[in-house]
């Protein structure tokens, strides 16, 4: 019932016992009848339909706003987890810096996020420049408003560094787990 609900709360894999207890106590204080804590990567894997309970390896890469969490799961639990501070906000910063350095155009976070969502890509298109969009900003030379066209290929170039950081984290995770699980994933 709504007056005494059972609650399932996702927690980061790095949460300490003290943090988990605080989360549980907060839910109890809010009136929960029963509280279940589940590691975020396990919840994500279940939501993605991965075989988390089986004796096979699965990998979840959760790119959030501030951190990216990489986790390997098997037999219903987390075998290895790590996080890196390369995520959505770093993507936005990389786009802003790219526009400033390559096009002498100042844009804000909202514009960078829109670019990321509309034409963002971790890799360049196979052929050509891919999709494009018009972007408005302030010309850093004249100080006047300016509109230019930016391609998917250019955004992939802008995102190369934070994407490479995430890929390195994935590779390190694969090196840390048993070879049998790596073989399941790759």
Show where each model-derived region lies.
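Nucleotide/phosphate-binding catalytic cleft detector across ATP-hydrolyzing
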Residues: 1-63, 71-186
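Conserved Rossmann-like nucleotide-cofactor binding loop
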Residues: 66
